[in-house]
Amino acid sequence: MKRSLFSLLPFLTTCAGEPPQNIGVQDGRLTACPESPNCVSSFESDVEHGIQPLQASLRQVERVLLGLVEANIVESRDGYLHAEFTSRLMRYVDDVEFLEDSTAGVIHVRSASRLGYSDLGANRKRIENIRGLLKQN
């Protein structure tokens, strides 16, 4: 039995994928989504990738994330926050970014899967869940 569990460890750790090199703020915006349907961003305008920004402060977003077991804040600086979300079963890691736009009074978002092509709407659901939690607080 132990041997079976240990043989699964390499597979489970590879589900995390490598941290992307192309995330962060570039020219005042979050990185564009790839063509694959496993990403949403408030900077995108097409139906598949576009999502509304959050009506909140970055501090409120951070408080919500700290209450989510699957979230791990990786970076928080100067109006930008990067968190990794790990799925419970397969341990897939997705990258979620938040960028404060003080002029517009919103938080721009980008949520993208590291692996695979389709996410079956997981990134959109995640952002909408965060939006709902922000409204409760």
Region locations from a protein language model:
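Sec-dependent bacterial lipoprotein signal peptides
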Residues: 1-12
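Ser/Thr-rich, low-complexity intrinsically disordered terminal regions
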Residues: 15-137
